[in-house]
Structure formats: structure tokens, C-alpha cells
Amino acid sequence: MPTVIYLTAQSINQTLSAATTPTGEPTETPTSIPPTIAPTDTPTPAPGFFPAAIQINKPGPGSRVISPLEVQIVAVAGDSNKIDVGLFGEDGRLLGHIIKVVPGHPTGDFLSLKVQFEIRAAAELGVLQVSTRDKLGHLQSLSSVRILLLSNGVSQITPAGNAIYERVTFQNLPVKADVTGGELSVQGQYTPYNNQPVIVELISDSGQGLSLRVLDFPNLDPQSFSTTLPYKVSGPTRARLFIHQEDDVLKGPAYIYSQELTLNP
């Protein structure tokens, strides 16, 4: 994604800040390693970037909204056939929550919703989160958009821009890949959501943590990374490769992407 999008994201965060006053058996102990970083200066999304599993088409980042909040999304629900939409205030309180059962189309289901909310202040920072889970109830994807909530006035909606693309792309690692040898090599490109550490993690379908790395990126530009995830399994094990970041406003994830694979000894 282009540098200009990064700069726009910075200006959005500055605007929002100025407008509000925030009232199995695991493997060896995971170790933090620095990423191999090669920032890109390309003016368009890098080859290989693809539409996100959760596309929040409306509202865009930095939108100023009154109640009801109009939400338009396209999301791949997965085996659960459910899409979870939550609106949070700047202190983490839940302002609105909707769960929709959808057909589960492989390319995603379209939803148009209205989320009612009430705030006591004239304005405050809000976070819209959309998530999906697998059939066992484990989070598999989550996307967030920061907006400004208004108690009255007129909504001003910004476009989604490059936010409709997935923040991560893995190189030479197809979905449902078979991995052997006790170590998964992961290379790709990632566009950070914020300045929080980025977690790359292997988790079995039973919910067991198998391996974890922590990556630190110096800025919010798209950047290349490379790491390895050692693991130990006694036989073929279905798992997911996760990459996620925590929200620096809410106490919880801001972004989650996962990909299915099978681990072999």
C-alpha cells in the first residue's frame, strides 16, 4: 500500500486525538526476534495483496458519525456462518453489538446494518470491529476502523480506501498448505495497524499454542518480514497461522488474519 495512505492514516489519528479527550504441548518458550524489513515505496498496493476476509466498506477511517451508524461490510464468515459487529467507545465500553447469521458464501457475504449508540460527551473516539469465528468458536479474522462518534450534527463519511485489502500477504505459503520438518518459514509483507508489536503464531485447531514470534516494525509503511516458527507435533495436526496486533485504545485485538494449514513432524 502506498506511502500516501500511511500519511493519511497518521493525519486521521492526529485529527481524532485532537477532537477527543480519552477519558497439545507447546514448543520451546517463544522468543522475540526482529523482522527482516525492507520498506516499499510503491504508489499502489503491492502485487499479491488481495481483498480482505473482512472488508469494512463503510464507514471509512476517520469518519464522523451520528447515531445510527450505517455499516456496510463484505466478510467471509467461515464455518460458523456468523458475522459479529461491535461498536466500542474510547474507554472500551460496548456501545452496540449485532451478530448476523449469513449463508457463508466462499467469497464473502454482504451486510448493510445500522448500529444505534448513545454517548454522553459531544464527541468521542469510537472503534468499529467486525470479526468471524471458526466452527469451534475461535476467532479467525478481525478488522477495526477508528471513527469519531458525535452526539448530534451531520455524519461525514470518508472512503474505505486501501483498507479493503488484507494487511498481510504471505509468500510461497498457499492456504491449507502441508508443512513438514518441525519448522515453518514465513515470509511476506505487512502493513501495521498501529505501533504495537505484531504477533505471528501457530495455534492448533484444538486451541493449543504451538509456536510464537514477536515482530517489531519501525513505522506504519508496508514492510517485508521474514521469520521462522519451530513446532513439535507427533502426527498430522490441523492448525492456523495467525498474525495479529493489539489495539492501543481498546484492551484487545485490533487486527487478526489467519490461514489454515496442516503441520507434520
Write out the residue ranges for each language-model feature.
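Intrinsically disordered, low-complexity Ser/Thr/Pro-rich tracts
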Residues: 1-265
